[in-house]
Amino acid sequence: VVPYNDDGPAVGCQEISFKTVASWVNSPDAFKITIDTRNLNTSSSASNQFRLNLNKGFPDNLIYDFSVDWGDNQYNNNVTNDITHTYLIPGIYTISIIGNYPAHYNADTYRDNFKLLSIDQWGTQQWRSMKNAFYYCENMVYNATDIPNLSQVTSMQNIFHRAFKFNGNINNWDVSNVTDMTGVFFQASLFNQPLDNWNVSKVTEMDGMFYATPFNQPLTSWDVSNVNKMQDLFNNARVFNQPLNNWNVSNVTD
């Protein structure tokens, strides 16, 4: 900025340069979710709070450094640890996250899992893990239309475990580097979407993947030759009735 007045350039004033940073709320780069703080569970945060739990423990040891807009004109920058936000008014808010946020994580059954209402946008995050990402998120629906970057993801263990309302079209996901699909749709009681485009050739574990789901889509295109664990793969999946006679299960031991 060059100082200036009615007589021309100001003399003896300091020139200051700055840049304007646009809000990331409407950015296609942001990871966006919608929550309802009033959906309480045992050991959840208060009815006017929401907590982001970070997957920093062994064995993933992920590093975070992100900015979060909480949807109430409040935000935090350079977040590196678990964080809880308190809203003035309990209710529904859309949270936008940008920066180094390698994994969304629901540590166990009794946190803020029930507060998540929807996945709205994946953004351009480089995801590193999907383990327990939406575990026990029983009220969550899928509204995202973009595709997550899963090129560095090896574990999708329990990603939609007991996500009762989830029925998203995720057939275009690149899961070619995933090795662990244990419990991916375990008791996801609405899920019945095509998955025939998935490349599962590196997967070694599929225990309980479709346990108690209404899934009934063709899987003849799957290369399961590296899978060694299939225990309860279709257990209690009562409507599943698709041919699997071309599957190579020679490496399955469990």
Question: What is each residue range found by the language model?
Answer:
Residues 4-23:
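Extracellular fibronectin type III
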